[in-house]
From Swiss-Prot:
GO cellular component, as recorded: cytosol
Physiological role: Acts as a sulfur carrier required for 2-thiolation of mcm(5)S(2)U at tRNA wobble positions of cytosolic tRNA(Lys), tRNA(Glu) and tRNA(Gln). Serves as sulfur donor in tRNA 2-thiolation reaction by being thiocarboxylated (-COSH) at its C-terminus by the MOCS3 homolog UBA4. The sulfur is then transferred to tRNA to form 2-thiolation of mcm(5)S(2)U. Prior mcm(5) tRNA modification by the elongator complex is required for 2-thiolation. Also acts as a ubiquitin-like protein (UBL) that is covalently conjugated via an isopeptide bond to lysine residues of target proteins such as AHP1.
UniProt protein name: Ubiquitin-related modifier 1
A family per Pfam: Urm1
InterPro entries, alphabetized: Beta-grasp_dom_sf, Mopterin_synth/thiamin_S_b, Urm1
Amino acid sequence: MVKVRVEFLGGLDVIVNKQRVYDLDVPSQVENVGDLIDYIIENLITNKKDVEVFIENDSIRPGIITLINDTDWELENEKEYVIEDGDVISFTSTLHGG
């Protein structure tokens, strides 16, 4: 098991039971951020219609900033980043209704 903190900010918490922060013990099969995204879809997004708010074309939807330990995930090899104990993964929506 690996302990990670996952944050859903900028209104994204509505797709994960309106909880902004999750401290998770993820199974050892969850090796990288891509695996973590799959884990989130399977275990945290209860209404499967909300998956399209989070994912588009097998990646995080444009308009969602993804940070790994406060660093843009594009600098950390995106979905291939290997998760380590204590990592903080943040998803922040920049899109808001008006």
